[in-house]
């Protein structure tokens, strides 16, 4: 799928501590390959200048409208600004970007490993493997027991 620039509107942006989960309404549904990402910005002005890369956690939608979800960690000024946005706030997104993960066609068992906020790329892979009825195990790591949020 070819990347495109879209304007979105935040449906929810909730978090606890340094991890946040953001759901965004976009004009049309996007298909993505697990491992792809978006460049996201939503603050006024040019400071910071560059949008922030966020892994696509999930996408959905119907009837010409779409949604895209991100799980992100506040690590600097840009993600701190994103964490302060609320439902209804506008965003600018370029997506989907990157090649994503490739899955060999042969039958095998998979170990999916993610650490910290990197877990957000593991779950789209698990969903793809589940659709193929593949065997897999998920291993998540974090610096503390409470610092790796489990998705709903």
What label would you give each PLM region?
Residues 77-152:
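FNR/FR-type flavoprotein reductase catalytic core
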Residues 1-87, 143:
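Ferredoxin-reductase
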């Amino acid at each position: 799928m070819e990347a495109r620039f879209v304007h979105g509107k935040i449906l929810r942006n909730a978090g606890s501590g340094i991890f946040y989960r953001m759901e965004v309404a976009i004009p049309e549904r996007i298909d993505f390959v697990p491992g792809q990402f978006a460049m996201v910005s939503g603050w006024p002005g040019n400071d910071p200048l560059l949008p922030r890369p966020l892994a696509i956690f999930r996408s959905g939608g119907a009837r010409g409208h779409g949604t895209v979800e991100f799980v992100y960690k506040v690590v600097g000024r840009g993600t701190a600004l994103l964490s302060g946005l609320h439902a209804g706030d506008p965003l600018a997104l370029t997506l989907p970007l990157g090649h994503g993960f490739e899955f060999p066609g042969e039958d095998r068992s998979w170990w999916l490993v993610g650490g910290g906020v990197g877990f957000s790329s593991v779950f789209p892979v698990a969903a793809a493997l589940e659709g193929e009825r593949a065997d897999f195990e998920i291993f998540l790591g974090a610096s503390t027991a409470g610092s790796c949020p489990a998705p709903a």
